[in-house]
Each structure stands twice: as structure tokens, then as C-alpha cells.
Amino acid sequence: MAGSRSIFEEVQDSQKPAAMPGGVSRDRGRGRARVRVFIMILFVMVVVQIAIGGLTRLTDSGLSITEWAPITGAIPPLDEAAWEAELEAYRATTEYQEQNRGMSLAEFKVIYWWEWGHRQWARFLGVVWAVGFVGLLATKSVPVGWTGRLLLLGVLGGLQGVAGWWMVHSGLAPGMFDVASYRLAVHLGLAFLILGLMAWYILRLGRAEAELMTARRDGDRMLAGMATGLLHLTALQILIGALVAGIDAGRNYIDWPLMAGAFTPPDMWAIEPWYRNLFENDGTVQFFHRVTGYLLFVIGVAAWIMARRSARTATKRAFDWMAVMLFGQIVLGIMTVMHSSPWYLAIVHQFGAVVLITLILRARFLARYPLPQSVRGAA
């Protein structure tokens, strides 16, 4: 009969697995850091693209290139004959015939370079994404579960290029002076969707998955829910802002808080059928942009007051900055309207939307995944 064996018998040293202290976590940490830096680069590039797009619209340059050539369009006109051909194509548009008739080649080049620059930066952004994505895959730097997220950013970027041409094409139709406002809203909304996803990914990658799982147990669901509602309302406000920009609604009704001496603008529902007023009536569109701004302020203040009761200092500070930016963005919007939407205020107001939605996402993230805090830090 075999001898008895203690259940506490030690395993011989030769049987023990080789220890690799911290090896796996270090590799995962490096991968998360690399992906995070990559997305940060893309985030900055998208912010620049939104600014270029805004200036392209404000300079009325968006219809200067009348064809969509994703590859060959990267090369601009190289001689006088090529420039004349581009100008001749632009002369066929309603915008030229009704607004820019007689435009010189030198004047045309200014608006052409704005639109070409906007498209070229988009191409560059696509190349950076593709090279970075392939490089991260080749070096096995992508953490588990993140390949699909990175691929999603690329797919949305490609879809954004298609949406951009879909928008421009609407402005090239006979009788159109500008792009369709609802298509502009789709184009801008998609840009902010991409930007928001990138911001959220950057926040998540800044901490280990295990830490996030632990932090979520201590999260404030009600406060995170308030931030989520504020995020959705801000997204709606950005879309309405795009409609305002698309029909130049910000240049009319420059009094505040009233509109032409009343709370609602005159002829608010003058266009038939009624729903077209929501897209085409400058007074109606601006009215809803104002009202949504007021609602944002109320909900934002409520979220800030709720955050003041949080024991987490970092969470409270995040909502402080969000509230400051929300107030600043509203003031900036009022100034933009009262000055009849000059280009420099309009572009700053658009950039303010980028900052605001990023700060809302950060506040939501810290409400959902609070940072660890000592008793002394909470005092």
C-alpha cells in the first residue's frame, strides 16, 4: 500500500512554474499606452478637420470643387490650363451664376484651396489611421477587445468622406446656392460622433481594465445618468447648430433675449408643410437653437449641483469645468447672434462645442468610473 501523503506537502522547486512578475501586465500596459497615443493623435487631427471645415463653410468655399475624386483629387491643378478647367466647372454652378459671377481666377483659387485643404486633411487623416492601425496590429500592441473599436473609427472615417461628398453634391444641384442644411447636420454630427468615441476611448485607455471594473462598483449611477442626458442634449444642440449654419439663420434676429421684439419669431410656421420650418425657416431654427441652449443650461446646473454632493474630488472638479464651459458657450452663442454671426465668433463658438462635449464626456466618465481617493483627499 502506498504511504500516506500530506495534503500540505510542498511542491518541489523543479515542479514550480517559472515566475514572470508583472510581465503580462507590463506588456498590456504598453499596448494600452500605444493605442491611447495613437487615438490622441487622431483626436487632434479631427479637431483640426472640424475647424477647417467650419472655415471652409464660412468662406463659402465648399462648392469650389465640383467632383469627388478621393485618389486623383489629392493632386491640385498644376498649370494655368488646369486651373481654368476647374474654374470653368465652377462656372456651371448656381452659386457662381447668382452670387460670384465674374469671379477672377485669383479669387477662385482662394476658395478652391480652402476646399482642397479640407479634403486633403481628410485624406491625410485616413492614411494616419491606416498606417497606425496596421502598425499596432503588426506589433501586437492592440489590447484584447480593442481591434474592433479601432476598426470602427476607420469605418466611420470612410463613411464621413462619403457623407461629405453627399453634402457637397446637394449644393451643386440646379437652383442651389449652398449645401442642404440637413446634410450639413449629418456631416457635422458624424464628425462629433467620431470625436466623442475617440475621447471616450482615450479616457478608458488611461486606466487598466481591472481598475475600471473596480471603479465602476463605486460609480454614481444617477450622476452618470444626468451626464448622459446632458451629452445627448448637447449632441442635439450641435445638430440644430448645423441647421442654423446651413441656412445662415444666425445672421437674422440679432436681438436677445427676444426675437424681433417677441419670444417667438414672426411667421414661425409660415412654410408648408409645417415640418419644413424646422429645417428651412431661419427664425424657427434659431428659436429652437436658443431654447435647447436654455434647457442645456438648466440640466447642466442641476448636474453640477448634484456633483457637489459627491465625495470624489476629481469628479466634482470635472463637473466644475463642464459647468464653466457650458456657461461660456452660452455667452459666446449670445454674442455670436447679437453680432450677426461674424466668422471669427462663429468658428470660436463651433470650437467651444468641441471643448464642451469633451468635458461632458470626461465628467460622465469620472461619475461612472471614479478615481480612487484617500480619506484625507475627501476631506
Curated annotation (Swiss-Prot):
* Cofactors (names): heme b
| Reactions listed under catalytic activity | Fe(II)-heme o + 2 A + H2O = Fe(II)-heme a + 2 AH2
Q: Which organism is it from?
A: Jannaschia sp. (strain CCS1)
The entry's protein name is Heme A synthase
MF terms from GO for this chain are: metal ion binding; oxidoreductase activity, acting on NAD(P)H, heme protein as acceptor
Name where it's found.
Cell membrane
Superkingdom of this protein's organism: Bacteria
Q: What class of enzyme is it?
A: oxidoreductase
Protein role: Catalyzes the conversion of heme O to heme A by two successive hydroxylations of the methyl group at C8. The first hydroxylation forms heme I, the second hydroxylation results in an unstable dihydroxymethyl group, which spontaneously dehydrates, resulting in the formyl group of heme A.
Q: Does the keyword Transmembrane apply?
A: yes
> Which controlled-vocabulary keywords does the entry list?
Cell membrane, Heme biosynthesis, Iron, Membrane, Metal-binding, Oxidoreductase, Transmembrane, Transmembrane helix
